[in-house]
């Protein structure tokens, strides 16, 4: 397994076990896809991490740059992230 493959396997395991520190550690070694970055943002919310808001805003920037979404989609995604900050323990 390549170093990146190993890091991705660790990232996946960390998400499954809701291990924030391990997920962050593995993510530093990867170029996360938009989907995986969102999974990390949700883990921040679940753990009520003070990093949640900044991570959510950075994810929104990537979403806008990489997806070319319609305005309605941007509004829905933004509202969903804002709600997510106040919900804890729900599955990703």
Q: Where are the language model's segments positioned?
A:
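Long, low-complexity, acidic Ser/Pro- and Gly-enriched intrinsically disordered regions
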Residues: 1-92
């Amino acid at each position: 397994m390549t170093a990146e493959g190993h890091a991705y396997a660790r990232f996946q395991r960390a998400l499954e076990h809701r291990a924030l520190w391990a997920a962050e550690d593995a993510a530093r070694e990867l170029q996360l896809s938009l989907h995986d970055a969102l999974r990390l943002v949700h883990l921040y919310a679940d753990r009520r991490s003070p990093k949640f808001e900044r991570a959510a805003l950075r994810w929104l920037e990537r979403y806008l740059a990489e997806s070319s979404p319609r305005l309605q989609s941007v509004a829905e995604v933004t509202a969903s992230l804002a709600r997510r900050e106040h919900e804890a323990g729900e599955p990703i």
